């Protein structure tokens, strides 16, 4: 069992379940016990906490996303950086990834492909307009 499941982060975020595994962090579904809101908590993996470069990238990601406000970009609610655990609390999207959608549906028709592409490009344009380049844009990182 994952060491974070069932635990509270800083007495506020009750970690419910693991929902995603990334290259340097895991994403959990959690409950903000202060208001009952369901959130996503991205926790930097323990093996990377002592890696200065990866920790810097993780911190930069949280700062960058926190500055963005766009309907196609998840909101950041909170961040924590400490010796114990480093995490970003974000809006929870109850859905599937674009990768999962394509695997289930198969080849997209052109109208659907254009629709998704426009939404993705609007989000990326907003990020670029704010000086941010998303370095990991791929179907498994896009929630529907």
Which residues does each predicted region cover?
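Conserved short submotifs of the Hanks-type protein kinase catalytic core
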Residues: 83-97, 101
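Protein kinase catalytic-loop region centered on the HRD/HxD motif
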Residues: 120-132
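Activation segment signature within eukaryotic-like protein kinase domains
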Residues: 116-117
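Activation-segment/catalytic-loop signature of the eukaryotic protein kinase fold
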Residues: 79
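Flexible N-lobe loop architecture of eukaryotic-like protein kinase catalytic domains
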Residues: 20, 60, 69-72
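AlphaC helix of the eukaryotic protein kinase fold
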Residues: 45-67
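Conserved N-lobe loop of protein kinases adjacent to the ATP-binding glycine-rich P-loop
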Residues: 31-38
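Protein kinase glycine-rich loop
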Residues: 16-22, 27
């Amino acid at each position: 069992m994952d060491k974070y499941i069932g635990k509270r982060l800083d007495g506020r975020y009750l970690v419910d379940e693991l929902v995603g595994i990334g290259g340097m962090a895991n994403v959990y579904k959690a409950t903000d016990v202060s208001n009952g809101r369901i959130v996503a908590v991205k926790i930097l993996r323990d093996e990377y906490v002592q890696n200065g470069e990866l920790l810097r990238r993780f911190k930069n990601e949280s700062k960058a996303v926190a500055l963005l406000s766009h309907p196609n970009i998840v909101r950041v609610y909170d961040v924590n950086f400490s010796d114990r655990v480093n995490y970003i609390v974000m809006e929870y999207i109850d859905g599937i990834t674009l990768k999962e959608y394509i695997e289930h549906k198969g080849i997209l028709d052109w109208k659907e492909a254009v629709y998704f592409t426009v939404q993705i490009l609007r989000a990326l344009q907003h990020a670029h307009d704010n000086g941010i380049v998303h370095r990991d844009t791929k179907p498994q990182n896009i929630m529907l």
